[in-house]
Design a protein with these regions (language model features):
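Nucleotide-sugar-dependent glycosyltransferase catalytic domains
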Residues: 2-71, 122-352, 357-382, 393-396, ...
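Nucleotide-activated donor-dependent transferases that construct or modify glycoconjugates
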Residues: 81-96
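A short, glycine/small-residue-rich beta-strand->loop->alpha-helix junction that serves as a flexible
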Residues: 93-104, 361-362
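A donor-sugar binding/catalytic signature common to diverse glycosyltransferases
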Residues: 99, 404-453
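Nucleotide-activated donor-binding/catalytic signature segment of Leloir-type glycosyltransferases, i.e.
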Residues: 380, 390-408
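Cys/His-rich, Zn2+-coordinating zinc-finger modules
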Residues: 519, 526, 539-579, 584
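Canonical RING-type zinc finger of E3 ubiquitin-protein ligases
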Residues: 525-536
């Protein structure tokens, strides 16, 4: 072990970190090396390696004790939402179909009192408009996004040569496109709509991967409310879904650290794009890496998570600005017309097991299909296999299997006896709400989190990661779904989930966190204030300004001040620790990408050193050498 990696060195780094005295860029990079590791094999990429830095976390134990001492032990009942004047609301969502669907019932409920626009990928326009909601196209191709995530196995920093050569530049271009489109979604008419109705957002609702949310809110001085289906707020209860560590494997302090590290590494890769967006499009000042990585936490932006308290309790660290709702089902059963062949298959025997991986892309669809078919046969089970984006079922199915395309989960799952899927939040919620035993085969990210939640709830067997999926493992999982204890637990859980109205809870959360009554017109509280009269010191809607305050000096009224914030708590300390290190990692990768673009077998390092022959064609080794050069 080198001097920089010795326990004594890590002790010194941890002590300096907690005292805000780690000023050396070289030491910060070394600290990042202590917290991460570059791995080969199916999990290529940058991963958390907390065992290597265990002594660092030992120094944080007193901080954690103080942090947890005063935490509330019981949830605080949420206040009633205030009376809210009609608003123009934009809901920005990036992701797959399952990511978009929960926002449609929320949007429809909000549209009873407000003007609502859902901004998402162009291919989801028909789904949004069928629900009677306005649409605006955001950038990015969800298919390409999913292919990238599957290739990298959800790695924060990809390191395979092909990824660095082709995928990283394409992903960065896609993020830049998404950022630019989020501002247009807040301020412009739908470019493809039948009527070019003006639009300016009074409230932004978004999921975290839409990137531009908080920056658009700052430029417009509007409230922001985040909604997501996976944990995105630091907690000691479980790790960040993209930290690539198994929930329950590490201590609370490591779980808490994982959120700050992931945020910093993500921002190291996109910070320059965000700053371009802020300065060139929004006319805002640039932000530092450490500040940008923690904006949502620093401003305590209201968050609603779409799962029930009974399944994943709200962590004690999460304050009153964070609410839990419930899974939200996008109901389609009442309009679905099934083909007769599907009805005949369902009527011909025992209820089948559903198998499908939704929007996940498979590297070898034929091999995966054969594994599924064989496991169903060995388990003496009938199956319905969904093709999805993985293109399953591309080989001739046996008589006990029916291959389907797009069928609504709420219709189909009511006719199945168990489900097997990738662990996406949408499919997980649909299966559990239907009261079905659930087998999760996670590929990346939050799918591992939901696989663990299902198993811990007793509603299914242990999850089977895709790189460990075998015919034997899948057969055993199908057999486990027949156990009476599993079936009873799944049925009980489904009944409890169906009894909670997640849409009402989510809308309640959005409205109660609005900065009312500061949004009201002082003279007509039923209208939104848009101007402020200096002479009278009152907030005004446009109508009152024209009638009663003609000739007065009025200014645009800003009911949210996104003034400067600063990192705080352990995440803030972590920003001080590895902010420069993450930026240095980004700079190193930025140098690595153009060099492999011009030469497949060589990398020009920052000091001009040429790689050894042993490094040629091996980006993992190149990245290790780059980190070691610090």
């Amino acid at each position: 072990m080198s001097e920089r990696q010795s326990p004594g060195f890590l002790d010194a780094v941890a002590t300096a970190f907690l005292r805000r005295r780690l000023h050396s860029r070289r030491l910060r990079v070394a600290a990042l090396r202590g917290l991460t590791t570059v791995s080969n094999g199916a999990g290529d990429g940058l991963q958390m390696d907390f065992d290597h830095a265990a002594s660092c976390f030992a120094h944080a134990t007193p901080w954690m004790a103080a942090h947890t001492k005063g935490l509330a032990t019981a949830p605080v009942p949420p206040a009633e939402p205030p009376r809210v004047p009609p608003l123009s609301i934009v809901i920005m969502v990036i992701g797959s179909r399952g990511d978009i669907q929960p926002f449609i019932p929320i949007g429809r409920r909000l549209a009873e009192r407000h003007r609502v626009r859902i901004a998402t990928h162009r291919e989801f326009r028909p789904m949004v408009e069928r629900a009677g909601l306005e649409f605006y196209p955001l950038g990015g191709d969800p298919h390409e996004m999913m292919e990238y995530i599957v290739k990298t196995r959800g790695s924060i920093v990809p390191t395979r040569l092909g990824q660095l050569w082709e995928d990283v530049p394409k992903k960065r271009a896609m993020i830049a496109e998404i950022l630019a489109s989020t501002w247009r979604a807040c301020t412009e008419p739908d470019p493809e709509g039948p009527e070019a109705q003006p639009f300016r957002a009074d409230l932004i609702v978004a999921n975290p991967p839409s990137y531009g949310h908080i920056h658009c809110a700052e430029a417009l001085h509007t409230p922001l409310h985040m909604i997501f289906t996976m944990p995105w707020t630091a907690t000691t209860a479980f790790p960040h879904p993209f930290a690539r560590i198994d929930p329950g494997t590490y201590r609370p302090i490591e779980n808490f650290f994982s959120y700050g590290i992931v945020d910093l590494l993500v921002w190291a890769g996109i910070g320059d794009l965000v700053d371009d967006f802020r300065t060139k499009t929004l006319n805002l000042s640039p932000i530092t890496l450490a500040d940008g990585a923690s904006l949502l936490d620093d401003y305590e932006v209201p968050f609603t998570y779409l799962w029930p308290e009974s399944l994943v309790p709200k962590p004690k660290e999460w304050g009153p600005h964070i609410d839990l709702a419930n899974f939200i089902e996008y109901e389609q059963a009442h309009t679905y017309q099934p083909p007769q062949s599907l009805l005949d298959f369902l009527a011909a025997g025992e209820a089948p097991i559903y198998v499908g991986f939704g929007s996940v892309v498979a590297e070898d669809p034929a091999a995966l299909t054969r594994t599924i078919f064989t496991a169903l046969d060995k388990a003496n089970a009938r199956g319905i296999v969904s093709q999805g984006w993985a293109h399953l079922g591309n080989v001739a199915p046996p008589p006990n299997i029916y291959v389907i395309g797009d069928v609504p989960h709420d219709w189909l799952f009511a006719r199945c006896r168990a489900v097997c899927h990738h662990g996406g939040a949408g499919t997980t919620s649909a299966g559990l709400r239907a009261g079905l035993p659930t087998v999760v085969v996670p590929f990346f990210g939050d799918q591992f989190f939901w696989g663990r939640v299902v198993a811990d709830a007793g509603a299914g067997p242990e999850p089977i990661p895709i790189d460990r999926l075998t015919t034997e493992a899948l057969t055993a999982a199908f057999d486990a779904c027949r156990r009476q204890q599993v079936r009873e637990r799944a049925s009980e859980l489904g009944g409890r989930l169906r009894a909670i109205n997640g849409v009402e809870l989510a809308v309640h959360s959005i409205e109660r966190h609005l900065p009312a009554p500061a949004m009201y017109c002082s003279e007509n509280p039923d209208h939104l204030a848009v101007l402020f009269c200096d002479r009278c010191g009152v907030r005004l809607c446009g109508r009152c300004s024209r009638l009663a305050h003609a000739g007065h000096v009025v200014h645009p009224y800003r009911y949210v001040d996104w003034g400067g914030g600063s990192p705080h708590g352990l995440v803030g300390e972590l920003a001080d620790l590895v902010g420069d290190a993450a930026q240095a990692l980004h700079a190193g990768l930025a140098e690595l990408v153009p060099s492999v673009t011009s030469s497949r077998d060589g990398v020009v390092f920052s000091d001009g050193e040429s790689p050894s022959n042993a490094d040629r064609g091996d980006p993992i080794r190149k990245l290790r050498r780059w980190l070691a050069s610090w």
